[in-house]
C-alpha cells in the first residue's frame, strides 16, 4: 500500500508545474496586452488626430488586413503547437516547421489575391489603395512569426517578448510620425516593419536548434487539412471581433465606420482580456482528458465559473460606463460610439462561453466537425444580419449583428454538448467527480 504522505520531491515537482503554468499565463497575457490593450494607448491619439472619417478608413483597411492575417496564420498556433509538443524527435519537428512554412507561403499568395480583388471591387479601397496594401502586407508579415513553435516547446515568453517589443516600437513610431489623416498608411508601415524584424529574429532562434528545410508541398497541404477545423472557428470568431468594420464599410460611409471602429476597439480590448486563459489551458485540457475525463470536466467548469463572472462584470462596466469611457478614450467627436459600446458589451458572456465550450471542450473531445458546423452557421448569420441591418441602422445595426451571431454560436455549442451528454455541468459528470 502507498502512504498518504506526499514527499518533498513530489511537492517540488508540483510547485514547479504550477509555476510553469503561471509563467505561461503571464507570458500569453503579455502578448494579449500588446494586441488588445496597447491600442487603448494609441487610439485616443489616433481618434483625435484622424477624426471619425479617417479612423473609419483605417479601421476598414485594418479589418480587411486582419482577414489576410487570419488566412496566413490559419490556426497553426493550435494545430501545429500540438504537433510540436508531441513530436518524438528533432527530425519530426523540422518536418513540422517546413510543412507550416510551406502552408504559409501558399496562404500568403491567397491573401494577396484576395487583396487584389478587393482593391478593384470595393469603392473605398479603389480610392485608397495605399492604405489597403500597407494594411494587408503588414498583417501577413505578422502572421509569419513562428509563434506555434515557441508555444509547442513551452517557451511562450520568447514569442511574447518578440511580439510585445515589435508593437511597442511601432506605437512609439506612431506618436512620432503620424500627424494627420494623410499619414494613415504610416500606421501599417510601422507595424509591418517591426513585424518583419521579429520574424527574422524568430527564425534565427529556430535555426540555431533545427535545420530549416525547404517545404514539401504535399506535406504543406496535409498541414492545411489538419488545421482546417481551427481555421473555421477562428474565421467565424474573427468576423465577430475583427472583420466587422470592413463589412460595415460596404454599406456605410467612413464616418459611420469610425464610430463603430472606436467602440469595437474598446470592447475588444476589454473583453479580450479573458481569452489568454483559454489559450494556455487548451493543451493542458487536451492532455488531461486522456488521463481523467472527469478531472478535465471539472477544470472546464471551474474555468467557466471564473470567466463567466469576469465577463459579466466587464459587460456591466462597459454598459454603465460607456459615456465616460468613450469620451475619455475617443474624445467628444465620437458620442455616437456610446450606443455601439453598450450593445457590444452584451457579447462579453457569450465570448467567454464560446471560448470555454469551444476551445477547451469541444475541440479537446475531438468534435471538430460539430465545431465547424456551429461556427459556419454563426458566420452566415452574422453576414446575413449585417447585410440586413447595416444599410438601415448603420453602426448600431452592425453591433446587433455581432451580438446575435455570437449568442447563436454559444447556444449551439451548449446544445451540441447537451445532446451528446458531454455537458461538463451535467449531473452525471459532477457525480463522477464526487
Describe these PLM feature segments.
Residues 3-4, 20-77, 171, 229-255, ...:
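Signature of the first transmembrane helix
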Residues 6-21, 184-187, 191, 200-242, ...:
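Interhelical loop/hinge segments that connect adjacent transmembrane helices in multipass membrane
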Residues 129, 139-162, 348-374:
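Membrane-interface junctions at transmembrane-helix termini in multi-pass inner-membrane proteins
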Residues 129, 133-136, 160-208, 264, ...:
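Hydrophobic alpha-helical transmembrane segments
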Amino acid at each position: 500500500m502507498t502512504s498518504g504522505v506526499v514527499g518533498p520531491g513530489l511537492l517540488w515537482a508540483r510547485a514547479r508545474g504550477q509555476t510553469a503554468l503561471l509563467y505561461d499565463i503571464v507570458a500569453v497575457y503579455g502578448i494579449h496586452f500588446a494586441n488588445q490593450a496597447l491600442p487603448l494607448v494609441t487610439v485616443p491619439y489616433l481618434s483625435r488626430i484622424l477624426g471619425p472619417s479617417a479612423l473609419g478608413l483605417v479601421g476598414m483597411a485594418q479589418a480587411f488586413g486582419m482577414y489576410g492575417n487570419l488566412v496566413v496564420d490559419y490556426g497553426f498556433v493550435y494545430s501545429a503547437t500540438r504537433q510540436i509538443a508531441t513530436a518524438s524527435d528533432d527530425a519530426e519537428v523540422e518536418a513540422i516547421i517546413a510543412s507550416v512554412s510551406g502552408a504559409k507561403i501558399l496562404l500568403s499568395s491567397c491573401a494577396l489575391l484576395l487583396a487584389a480583388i478587393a482593391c478593384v471591387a470595393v469603392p473605398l479601397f479603389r480610392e485608397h489603395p495605399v492604405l489597403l496594401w500597407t494594411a494587408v502586407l503588414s498583417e501577413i508579415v505578422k502572421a509569419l512569426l513562428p509563434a506555434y513553435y515557441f508555444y509547442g516547446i513551452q517557451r511562450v515568453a520568447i514569442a511574447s517578448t518578440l511580439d510585445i517589443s515589435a508593437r511597442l516600437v511601432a506605437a512609439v513610431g506612431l506618436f512620432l510620425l503620424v500627424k494627420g489623416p494623410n499619414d494613415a498608411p504610416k500606421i501599417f508601415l510601422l507595424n509591418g516593419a517591426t513585424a518583419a524584424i521579429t520574424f527574422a529574429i524568430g527564425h534565427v532562434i529556430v535555426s540555431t536548434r533545427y535545420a530549416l528545410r525547404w517545404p514539401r508541398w504535399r506535406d504543406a497541404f496535409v498541414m492545411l487539412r489538419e488545421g482546417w477545423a481551427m481555421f473555421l472557428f477562428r474565421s467565424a470568431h474573427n468576423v465577430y471581433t475583427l472583420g466587422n468594420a470592413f463589412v460595415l464599410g460596404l454599406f456605410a460611409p467612413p464616418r459611420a465606420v469610425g464610430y463603430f471602429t472606436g467602440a469595437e476597439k474598446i470592447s475588444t480590448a476589454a473583453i479580450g482580456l479573458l481569452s489568454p486563459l483559454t489559450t494556455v489551458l487548451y493543451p493542458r485540457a487536451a492532455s488531461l482528458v486522456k488521463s481523467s475525463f472527469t478531472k478535465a470536466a471539472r477544470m472546464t467548469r471551474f474555468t467557466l465559473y471564473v470567466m463567466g463572472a469576469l465577463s459579466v462584470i466587464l459587460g456591466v462596466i462597459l454598459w454603465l460606463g460607456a459615456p465616460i469611457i468613450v469620451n475619455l478614450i475617443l474624445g467628444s467627436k465620437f458620442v455616437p460610439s456610446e450606443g455601439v459600446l453598450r450593445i457590444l458589451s452584451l457579447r462579453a458572456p457569450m465570448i467567454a462561453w464560446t471560448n470555454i465550450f469551444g476551445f477547451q471542450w469541444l475541440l479537446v473531445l475531438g468534435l471538430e466537425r460539430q465545431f465547424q458546423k456551429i461556427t459556419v452557421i454563426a458566420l452566415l448569420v452574422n453576414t446575413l444580419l449585417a447585410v440586413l441591418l447595416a444599410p438601415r441602422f448603420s453602426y448600431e445595426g452592425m453591433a446587433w449583428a455581432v451580438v446575435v451571431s455570437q449568442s447563436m454560436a454559444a447556444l449551439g455549442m451548449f446544445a451540441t454538448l447537451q445532446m451528446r451528454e458531454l455537458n461538463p455541468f451535467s449531473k452525471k459528470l459532477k457525480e463522477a467527480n464526487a
